[in-house]
Curated annotation (Swiss-Prot):
Annotated membrane topology: Multi-pass membrane protein
GO molecular-function terms, A-Z: GDP-Man:Man1GlcNAc2-PP-Dol alpha-1,3-mannosyltransferase activity; GDP-Man:Man2GlcNAc2-PP-dolichol alpha-1,6-mannosyltransferase activity
Protein name in the entry: Alpha-1,3/1,6-mannosyltransferase ALG2
Subcellular localization(s) per the UniProt record: Endoplasmic reticulum membrane
Length: 503
């Protein structure tokens, strides 16, 4: 007797804008991991530019459907959070109206939670996971009274809609602590599912190999900092520590990061860092990678011969990988990072990491001095203090000479166990297994909401059309053909019949 076929679970991701940011990388990795584990996966998004997305999306490995891209992302440069929520609600409405809403066993939503109640009400047999990268209300700027007032309803909406999810995931224990302080009225204990890094090595472009030969001579050693050119990244910590270190004469410091010519902070901050380097008597040079890639022959190696600091802007992913592979140490300067993916990208190559002892690095980096016999060490965690950092730079030289293989072994091992795509998808898989059979139970809001909505619509219709009965027949048609709600259809037909035949 043949066995019955096993049901293939269907998972839908709902994400606002499928670009190339950190949140998008997590969604793509989670989707690909679950797909490889046997799930039927679809990503729904309000926007996806196939020329500006990750390879798994570009080459069709993952199924992506766009809904609502025609809706505006802002109104005269303002109201972006309002537009983002409306775009997500439209996307969800489209799933409801087309009947796709009931096709999926699990919905995984991130960044915006406004659609969660609609999923809860219209897909009662599905489960909803919400992945919180960080509370949105803590990321929003509140300059002035009007902006503070404008944010209030969205803060309330975020807390309520997030609490409707069947389970909530966060990207680190640090975010979990912030979540608990921010959403104190939610009796929720989020589960930590760490983001991952791709353990496969990216192909290095010949152009980037040639550039490395130009900027490094005679096997010169260098430290590396990778961050966006933003003041909150505290890149001056790396520069000052390097200036105070004895290694300034034998090493270089490469500052690499995202840089937008249309972003005034990026431009101003780079100038501030260059000024700091000059004040510290460190010779420096700036290389714009986009300009270099257009005319590599116009960039001779003599430009870099005496430079102690090299500021690199907008480098390719290929050059970034090459820089990480060859550096002596990654200097990760931000404080209170929600997670921080760059240390993982360094550790996968066996590169030690020096990071600030707050936020995500506390969970990703194993401090050299905090482990017995330095077992499992992957770097150093220190306060955001240049003196402390310069000491590590000097002390690390002897450590590398005696036992550099320690980091070469420990980094990749830790990545594979905790931060690989397989590890992350396994955590998602276990979470889905846990909630898929869990009874949702009855919630007061979900019981009252449909009735309150029907009453509101009926009251508004009565005010607008008076005793006319035809609007209710129209509402019945909309409920059946658009909303596909049998209960609402029957209700409006009863109202229609009552108005027509009660007199």
């Amino acid at each position: 007797m043949s066995e019955a076929p096993v049901h293939q679970r269907k998972v839908a991701f709902i994400h606002p804008d499928l670009g190339i940011g950190g949140a998008e990388r997590l969604v793509v990795d989670a989707a690909a991991g679950l797909q490889n584990a046997g799930y039927d996966v679809t990503i729904y998004t309000s926007h996806c530019d196939k020329s500006h997305c990750f390879e798994e999306v570009k080459n069709g490995t993952l199924k992506v459907e766009v809904r609502g891209d025609a809706l505006p992302t802002h109104i005269f440069g303002k109201f972006s959070i309002l537009c983002a929520n409306l775009r997500q609600l439209y996307l969800t409405w489209n799933l409801i109206s087309t009947g796709k809403i009931e096709e999926y066993d699990v919905y995984i939503v991130d960044q915006l939670s406004s659609c969660v109640p609609l999923l809860h009400l219209n897909a009662p047999d599905s489960k909803v996971l919400f992945y919180c990268h960080f509370p949105d209300q803590l990321l929003a700027r509140r300059d002035g009274l009007l902006k503070k007032l404008y944010r209030i309803p969205f803060d309330i909406l975020e807390q309520f809609t997030m609490g409707v999810a069947d389970t909530i995931l966060v990207n680190s224990n640090f975010t979990k602590q912030v979540f608990a302080k921010t959403f104190q009225s939610l009796a929720v204990d989020p589960k930590v599912v760490y983001p991952c890094v791709n353990v496969e090595q990216e192909e290095i472009l010949p152009l980037d190999k040639d550039l490395m030969k130009k900027i490094l001579k005679n096997n010169e050693k260098y430290y590396l900092s990778i961050n966006r050119y933003e003041r909150k990244k505290n890149i001056e910590l790396a520069i000052t520590a390097f200036a105070q270190s004895k290694q300034r004469t034998s090493h270089k410091l490469f500052i690499s990061g995202g840089y937008d010519l249309n972003n005034s902070e990026n431009i101003d901050y780079l100038k501030e860092l260059e000024t700091l380097a000059t004040e510290l008597k460190l010779k420096h040079v700036h290389l714009s990678y986009p300009e270099y890639s257009k005319s590599p022959d116009k960039c001779p190696s003599s430009n870099f011969a005496d430079a102690q600091i090299l500021f690199l802007t907008s480098v390719s992913s290929s050059l970034k990988e090459l820089l990480l592979q060859s550096t002596e140490m990654l200097l990760y300067t931000p404080s209170n990072e929600h997670f921080g993916i760059v240390p993982l990208e360094a550790m996968k190559y066996g590169v030690p990491v020096l990071a600030v002892d707050t936020g995500g690095p506390l969970e990703t980096v194993v401090d050299y001095n905090e482990t017995p016999s330095h077992i499992d060490a992957t770097g150093w965690l220190r306060p955001s203090d240049a003196d402390e950092w310069s000491k590590v730079l000097d002390q690390s030289v002897d450590i590398f000479e005696k036992n550099h293989s320690l980091f070469e072994v420990n980094g990749p091992k830790r990545i594979k166990y905790y931060f690989s795509r397989e590890a992350m998808s396994k955590n998602f898989d276990n979470t889905i297994d846990h909630i898929i059979w869990k009874s949702r139970g009855t919630r007061l809001w979900s019981t009252l909401a449909p009735g309150l909505l029907m009453f509101t619509v009926q009251y508004a219709t009565l005010l607008i059309t008076g005793d006319a009965s035809w609007p209710y027949l129209l509402l019945a048609a909309i409920s059946y053909f658009v909303l596909r709600s049998v209960k609402a259809t029957v209700y409006w037909i009863i109202v229609f019949c009552y108005l027509n035949y009660s007199t």
